[in-house]
């Protein structure tokens, strides 16, 4: 049996197990920009494991769990604000299912004044990166070109 937050590889796609309800497992593709949780039957998972078409993988976001966040920093503030937005949603199991997710998100949008697109993005980021508060940290580590020289020798912008 798979545990919650396990990452598996199936058909060149990495999936994270989000929940294990009585019907089977709920998983999400962690590499897709527009993935949503899907329910997959436990019998199907067991058959895929038996046929060796489903393999365990290392968690690519495993370092986020223990990543230290400086107290009072902008990163901590953003993470906490994002967590406040989705906290009421992630406690409800109905948010995993397409038929009820839209209504829950619409209700939360009306409560907070946040666009639907933002809530969907934050939920997806939370689920794909390990269902921990640090999953909502900003991606500033991907910005810039560390170690690269600037291509231009002139300053950018309009000349004075």
Question: Where do the language-model regions lie?
Answer:
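Secondary-structure boundary/capping micro-motif
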Residues: 1-160
């Amino acid at each position: 049996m798979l545990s919650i937050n396990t990452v598996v590889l199936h058909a060149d796609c990495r999936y994270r197990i989000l929940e294990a309800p009585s019907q089977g497992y709920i998983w999400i593709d962690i590499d897709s920009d527009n993935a949503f949780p899907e329910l997959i039957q436990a019998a199907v998972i067991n058959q895929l494991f038996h046929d060796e078409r489903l393999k365990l993988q290392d968690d690519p976001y495993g370092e986020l769990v223990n990543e230290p966040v400086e107290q009072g920093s902008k990163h901590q503030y953003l993470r906490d604000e994002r967590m406040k937005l989705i906290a009421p949603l992630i406690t409800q199991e109905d948010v995993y299912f397409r038929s009820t997710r839209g209504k829950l998100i619409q209700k939360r949008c009306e409560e907070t004044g946040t666009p639907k697109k933002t809530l969907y993005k934050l939920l997806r980021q939370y689920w794909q990166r390990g269902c921990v508060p640090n999953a909502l940290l900003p991606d500033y580590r991907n910005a810039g070109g560390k170690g690269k020289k600037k291509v231009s020798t002139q300053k950018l912008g309009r000349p004075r």
